[in-house]
A protein has these predicted regions:
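Short, flexible N-terminal segments of the mature chain
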Residues: 15-36
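Charged interaction segments
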Residues: 19, 23, 39-76
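Hydrophobic residues in beta-strands and at strand termini
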Residues: 9, 37-39
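Short glycine-/aliphatic-rich beta-strand segments at the starts of folded cytosolic domains
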Residues: 1-9
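Short connector loops at helix/strand junctions that flank enzyme active sites
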Residues: 2, 30-32, 57
C-alpha cells in the first residue's frame, strides 16, 4: 500500500530515527516534511513502527491510498 507520511517534529526533538525509518522503507521525498512510502504493513503495524521513532508531542500523520485509489488519513 502506498502511504504518505507528513510530520512536524517539535523543536529540540531528534529527527534521525524518523529519517532512518523512512530510509528503511525507501521513502521518496515529496516536500520538506512529506515522504511517500510503499510497503505491505497494515496501517496499525505501520503506525506502531512510527511511534517507536518519535516522541509523543511530535505531530505525524499518515495518508494511505488503498487499491481502489481511495484516500484516508490518521494521526499517529
Amino acid at each position: 500500500m502506498k502511504r504518505l507520511i507528513t510530520y512536524d517534529i517539535i523543536k529540540g526533538n531528534d529527527y534521525s530515527k524518523l529519517y532512518e525509518f523512512i530510509e528503511k522503507y525507501k521513502g521518496i521525498q515529496i516536500t520538506e516534511s512529506t515522504y511517500e512510502i510503499t510497503c505491505s504493513l497494515s496501517l496499525d503495524v505501520f503506525k506502531q513502527e512510527i511511534r517507536k521513532v518519535i516522541r509523543s508531542n511530535d505531530k505525524v500523520y499518515v495518508i494511505s491510498v488503498n487499491k481502489d485509489k481511495a484516500l484516508f488519513y490518521t494521526k499517529v
